[in-house]
C-alpha cells in the first residue's frame, strides 16, 4: 500500500527523478524503441539502473512496451524548453571592418548568417517562441522576419554604454524555461540544443587549461566563474534556465544592474557570481567543434576564404 501511495504522489506532482528523466527524455527524442543497452550508452547509466528505471516508468504508465506514452510526454512537459532569448545588441568591435555596417550575428559565413544556425537549432528542438534583443544597427535584424516570421524583437537602447547585462534587463521577464544565447556563435552541431532539461545548465567544454572565461565545477555544479584556469570548463555562451530560476533571475538581474558598477557586468555573473547562493547551475558538456566562436576578422578569414581578399 505504501508503494502505491508513493507512486500516486509522484504522479500528482509529476516530478521525475533524475534517472527517470534521463531515460524518458531519450525515449522522447528518439521517436522509437531502443534496447536497454542503447539506453545505457546514451544515458551513461548502467544496465541494471536502466532496467530498474524502465520498470518504474512502466508502472507509472509513462512507458509501454519500451515506448514513451502520452502520459510520459506530459510528465516531461515541465522540463521542456519553451522559449529562446538571443543577446544580439552589441557592436562586434573585434570583428571590424565587417561590423561597421553589419551586426555580428548577421555576418554571413559560407553564405549563411551566423544567427540562422542557432535559430534553426531552436526550431528543430520545438522552440518557436524566439526573442532577439537588439541595439546596434537594430533595423538590420528586420531582414530575419522573411525567413523567421515568429521572431519578436526587444530593444536595448543602452547597449552602447552598458555590458550585456543591459540586454538581460530588457528580457528579464522571459527567462523561465528559456535558453539564452550569445547570438554570434557559429553552431556546427545543432543537436546540442535539446528539448528537455532537468535543471538549469550552462554549456561548456572540458579543458586542461584555458585563457578564456571558464567554470570551476564540483559534482556537476558550477561553483565559480573566472578568466583562465587549469582543469576547468571553458564557457560557451549558451545556457538554459528552468521555471523557478527564471523567476529569480528577473529580480536578481534588476538588483545587480542597479547597484554601483552593475551596468558593467556580464549578465551570467548574476546567477554565477553575485547571487550564486540562489542557484544551482549544472554544467552541460559539449565538444570543441560543436560551436565555433569567431572573435576576430582573422579568424573569420580563416574559416571563410571569401573574406580573404
Model-derived features with residue positions:
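Short, Lys/Arg-enriched N-terminal segments with co-localized hydrophobic residues
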Residues: 1-11
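Short amphipathic alpha-helical interface segments
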Residues: 13-42
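Conserved alpha/beta core of the MobA/IspD/sugar-nucleotide pyrophosphorylase nucleotidyltransferase superfamily
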Residues: 28, 67-69, 73-84, 235-309
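Conserved beta-loop-beta/alpha segment of the NTase-like Rossmann-fold superfamily
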Residues: 141-213
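A short, conserved structural fragment
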Residues: 58-67
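Conserved core of the sugar-phosphate nucleotidyltransferase
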Residues: 22, 189-261
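Short amphipathic alpha-helical interaction segments
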Residues: 44-56
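N-terminal glycine-rich phosphate-binding loop and ensuing alpha1 helix
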Residues: 24-27, 74-134, 138
Amino acid at each position: 500500500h505504501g508503494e502505491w501511495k508513493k507512486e500516486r504522489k509522484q504522479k500528482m506532482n509529476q516530478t521525475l527523478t533524475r534517472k527517470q528523466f534521463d531515460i524518458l527524455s531519450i525515449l522522447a527524442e528518439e521517436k522509437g524503441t531502443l534496447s536497454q543497452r542503447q539506453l545505457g550508452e546514451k544515458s551513461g547509466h548502467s544496465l541494471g539502473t536502466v532496467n530498474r528505471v524502465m520498470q518504474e516508468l512502466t508502472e507509472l504508465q509513462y512507458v509501454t512496451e519500451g515506448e514513451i506514452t502520452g502520459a510520459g510526454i506530459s510528465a516531461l512537459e515541465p522540463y521542456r524548453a519553451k522559449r529562446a532569448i538571443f543577446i544580439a545588441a552589441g557592436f562586434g568591435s573585434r570583428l571590424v571592418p565587417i561590423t561597421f555596417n553589419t551586426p555580428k550575428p548577421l555576418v554571413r559565413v559560407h553564405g549563411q548568417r551566423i544567427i540562422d544556425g542557432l535559430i534553426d537549432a531552436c526550431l528543430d528542438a520545438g522552440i518557436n517562441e524566439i526573442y532577439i534583443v537588439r541595439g546596434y544597427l537594430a533595423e538590420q535584424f528586420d531582414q530575419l522576419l522573411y525567413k523567421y516570421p515568429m521572431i519578436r524583437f526587444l530593444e536595448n537602447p543602452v547597449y552602447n554604454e552598458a555590458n550585456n547585462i543591459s540586454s538581460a534587463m530588457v528580457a528579464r521577464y522571459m527567462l523561465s524555461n528559456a535558453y539564452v544565447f550569445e547570438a554570434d556563435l557559429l553552431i556546427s552541431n545543432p543537436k546540442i540544443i535539446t528539448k528537455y532539461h532537468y535543471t538549469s545548465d550552462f554549456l561548456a567544454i572540458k579543458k586542461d587549461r584555458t585563457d578564456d572565461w571558464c567554470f570551476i565545477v564540483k559534482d556537476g555544479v558550477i561553483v565559480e566563474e573566472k578568466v583562465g584556469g587549469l582543469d576547468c570548463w571553458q564557457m560557451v555562451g549558451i545556457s538554459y534556465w528552468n521555471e523557478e530560476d527564471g523567476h529569480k533571475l528577473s529580480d536578481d538581474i534588476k538588483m545587480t544592474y542597479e547597484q554601483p558598477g552593475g551596468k558593467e557586468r556580464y549578465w551570467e555573473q548574476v546567477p554565477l557570481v553575485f547571487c550564486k547562493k540562489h542557484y544551482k547551475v549544472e554544467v552541460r558538456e559539449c565538444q570543441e567543434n560543436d560551436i565555433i566562436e569567431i572573435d576576430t576578422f582573422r579568424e573569420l578569414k580563416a574559416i571563410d576564404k571569401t573574406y580573404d581578399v
